[in-house]
């Protein structure tokens, strides 16, 4: 059957990962809760805000890498808190120094503090510089299919359109734009931001996303560790449903059992 989907490995920057759930490290009560939640999530890629997290640049303070060791997790430094391309590029270069030449980064350049919406003009500028500088750039962007295409053409290895605004938990607000991005993209598409609960993650995966990145949905849950485990299963279920192919929607009913041979 030509329309049967077969699974393929989730690969970024030449590395293959088993988990399609990426998680952030902010907003937890303490480092122990961070550790427990990330363990429960099964995530292999953990994103860290370089400007807000001690990765060794502040000796004598708690170091996140002590509870999330780089030999167990792939650390994905991000540029959260940057509002222009210059800041973002500087932050990525700092991360590379702190992580011994690590080139995989998550680029985000924000427009304002109220919406945390991406500034796509500055994002594109930063992406072009970082790619030339040898970085493997995963990029947070709007759900504009044209911008997503331009970022991929600039050399980003993955585009990460928002489902909803960061920290809102609103779920996928514009599935139609996301579907266009998924159909057109030649690089992996990961939903980033806006996920609120397990069903949101499942829907993103059912649509065909390669993976989902989240932080607030787990950290702000009443029981973060339990929600982390729920998200692990949600991602797997969504991927399996995508591969299986859902039944077509119909307006009218269709009996599950055959009508011939009924007992009279």
From Swiss-Prot:
One of its GO terms (cellular component) is cytoplasm. Its main location: cytoplasm. It is an enzyme of class 2 (transferase). It holds the Pfam family ThiG. One of its GO terms (biological process) is thiamine diphosphate biosynthetic process. Its EC number is 2.8.1.10. It catalyses: [ThiS sulfur-carrier protein]-C-terminal-Gly-aminoethanethioate + 2-iminoacetate + 1-deoxy-D-xylulose 5-phosphate = [ThiS sulfur-carrier protein]-C-terminal Gly-Gly + 2-[(2R,5Z)-2-carboxy-4-methylthiazol-5(2H)-ylidene]ethyl phosphate + 2 H2O + H(+). GO terms for molecular function: thiazole synthase activity. The active site is at residue 106. This is Thiazole synthase. The gene is thiG.
């Amino acid at each position: 059957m030509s329309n049967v989907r077969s699974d393929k490995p989730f690969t970024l920057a030449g590395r293959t990962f088993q988990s399609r759930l990426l998680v952030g490290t902010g907003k937890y009560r303490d480092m122990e809760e961070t550790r427990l939640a990330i363990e429960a999530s099964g995530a292999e890629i953990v994103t860290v805000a370089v400007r807000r997290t001690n990765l060794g640049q502040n000796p004598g303070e708690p170091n996140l890498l002590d509870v999330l060791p780089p030999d167990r997790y792939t650390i994905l430094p991000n540029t959260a808190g940057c509002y222009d391309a210059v800041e973002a590029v500087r932050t990525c270069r700092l991360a590379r120094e702190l992580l011994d030449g690590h080139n995989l980064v998550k680029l985000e350049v924000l427009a304002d503090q109220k919406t945390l919406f991406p500034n796509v003009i500055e994002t594109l500028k930063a992406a072009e510089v970082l790619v030339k500088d040898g970085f493997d750039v995963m990029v947070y962007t709007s759900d504009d299919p044209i911008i997503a295409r331009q970022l991929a053409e600039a050399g980003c290895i993955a585009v990460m359109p928002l489902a909803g605004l960061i920290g809102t938990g609103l779920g996928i607000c514009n599935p139609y734009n996301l579907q266009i991005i998924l159909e057109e993209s030649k690089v992996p598409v990961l939903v980033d931001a806006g996920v609120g609960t397990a069903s949101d993650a499942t829907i993103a995966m059912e649509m065909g996303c390669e993976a989902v990145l989240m932080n607030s949905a787990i950290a702000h849950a009443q029981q973060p560790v339990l929600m982390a485990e729920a998200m692990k299963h949600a991602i797997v279920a969504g991927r399996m449903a995508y591969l299986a192919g859902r039944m077509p929607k119909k307006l009218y009913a269709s009996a599950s059992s055959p009508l011939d041979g009924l007992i009279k």
